[in-house]
């Protein structure tokens, strides 16, 4: 086991690993422990009472964080003609059809979100083995297969994040940067949790929101008292 650095020891000492903190105090501690030279992301992790191996217990969706993510999101769009022009005008960095297919098949995936018009899905489907594992496959349920490409591009760049529960019932997301004011991080935290609560699947039994924590990219996790979480 690697030795902890002095900075890591100081960070660990500032957080009581046995204590459940209120949301505001937890966010303040996560910000306090974001001491790297880069602007660390503040992340939230939730442990849900679901088993995603069952189709009726899958938790997936999108949410727009009201204060944005602080990230520069590159958007790729599969579209032709006027819809391709709309995507470019809305700020999409990568727009194309067969040419974009060939670029991706050649090993270059130069975007963080992928949007497609419905008529492009036959083409995009051939990229499933490349885009799927990266979480980039356009999906009509997530609003990324649409004729409203301009709106989708602006949403992707304006603070919209996708979420999907993992095998152990964990769901996580960045909710902003450490440089954000604490109240902005709280607003994003509340919006994210609210979306998760609204996405509660029909097959979920017992307690839904079991555990919660926040952390910075390089900092320790700060456990949250779920009784202090709206909608828990």
Swiss-Prot record:
It comes from Rhizorhabdus wittichii (strain DSM 6014 / CCUG 31198 / JCM 15750 / NBRC 105917 / EY 4224 / RW1) (Sphingomonas wittichii). Part of the 50S ribosomal subunit. SUPFAM superfamilies: Ribosomal protein L1. GO terms for biological process: regulation of translation; translation. GO terms for molecular function: rRNA binding; structural constituent of ribosome; tRNA binding. Belongs to the universal ribosomal protein uL1 family. Keywords: Repressor, Ribonucleoprotein, Ribosomal protein, RNA-binding, rRNA-binding, Translation regulation, tRNA-binding. The gene is rplA. This is Large ribosomal subunit protein uL1. One of its GO terms (cellular component) is cytosolic large ribosomal subunit. PROSITE patterns: RIBOSOMAL_L1. PANTHER family: 54S RIBOSOMAL PROTEIN L1, MITOCHONDRIAL, LARGE RIBOSOMAL SUBUNIT PROTEIN UL1M. Binds directly to 23S rRNA. The L1 stalk is quite mobile in the ribosome, and is involved in E site tRNA release. The lineage of its organism: Bacteria, Pseudomonadati, Pseudomonadota, Alphaproteobacteria, Sphingomonadales. HAMAP family: Ribosomal_uL1_B.
């Amino acid at each position: 086991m690697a030795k902890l650095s002095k900075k890591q020891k100081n960070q660990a000492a500032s957080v009581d690993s046995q204590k459940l903190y209120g949301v505001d105090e937890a966010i303040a501690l996560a910000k306090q422990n974001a001491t790297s030279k880069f602007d660390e992301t503040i992340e939230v992790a939730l442990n849900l009472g679901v088993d995603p191996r069952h189709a009726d217990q899958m938790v997936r969706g999108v949410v727009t964080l009201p204060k944005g993510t602080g990230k520069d999101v590159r958007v790729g769009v599969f579209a032709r003609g006027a819809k391709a022009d709309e995507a470019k005008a809305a700020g999409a960095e990568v727009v194309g059809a067969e040419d974009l297919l060939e670029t991706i098949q050649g090993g270059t995936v130069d975007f963080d979100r992928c949007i497609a018009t419905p008529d492009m899905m036959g083409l995009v489907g051939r990229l499933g083995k490349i885009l799927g594992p990266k979480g980039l496959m356009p999906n009509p349920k997530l609003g990324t297969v649409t004729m409203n490409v301009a709106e989708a591009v602006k949403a992707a760049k304006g603070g919209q994040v996708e979420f999907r529960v993992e095998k152990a019932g964990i769901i996580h997301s960045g909710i902003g940067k450490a440089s954000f004011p604490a109240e902005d991080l709280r607003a994003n935290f509340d919006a994210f949790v609210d979306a998760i609560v609204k996405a509660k699947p029909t097959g979920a039994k017992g307690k839904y929101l079991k555990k919660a924590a926040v952390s910075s990219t390089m900092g320790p996790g700060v456990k949250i008292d779920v009784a202090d979480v709206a909608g828990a």
